[in-house]
Amino acid sequence: MEVCAKWKVPIVITSLGARVELNEAVHAWGGITLHDVIDDRFARKAIEKGADGIIAVAAGAGGHAGRWSPFALIQEIRMWFDGPLILSGAIASGASVLAARAAGADLAYVGSPFIATNEANAPEAYKQAVIDSGAADIVYSDLFTGVHGNYLRSSIANAGLDPDNLAAGSLDMMKFGSEGSGKAKAWRDIWGSGQGIGVIDRTRTAASYVDLLADQYAAAKARICGA
């Protein structure tokens, strides 16, 4: 937070518990906060505690994610909230971005596909795993941090664990760092990823991927609107 305050970061994304004092601090330097939520109850709590907008993390999102359908999540939040609303969860194409907006989101949150870009500070093996994998290769588990999230099956297997027989985690074992002993850790050894990566077939620059999203968005809009 000291670094964010020093540089007056305009948009701060928060997660795993909305905090009044954090929101007030960001507002003091003129910034806004967007809070990750996995259901309507957490969305309401975030706004009550001063968050400016909501990131609705639906089923299929990379890393920590919820179980709700994106349609159910967006529609319940939109019933009472007209502020900034971003949808996250398996969004990897321009058509999916358009679908998010049609469902009621102001913006779409695209994450996992950027792991496979040239600029991403990720191991080459991680990038290749994203390229080689699809929705069937994503495992939803709370073992690694105590909070449910989506991870690449291959990274779990490479850590010597059985992706189909993982023990349950608990909140008192929350560990989000990559430092530590030889035990497998999220996110150093167990790689997060969303279910939308099936469309990622190569590494490319971030700019070219953004251009691709824009082209796909325009094509999908033309297909739906007939223009």
Pin down the residues of each PLM region:
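Conserved active-site-proximal phosphate/metal-binding subdomains
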Residues: 70-86, 92-227
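Active-site entrance/lid segments in N-terminal catalytic domains of soluble metabolic enzymes
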Residues: 1-80, 84
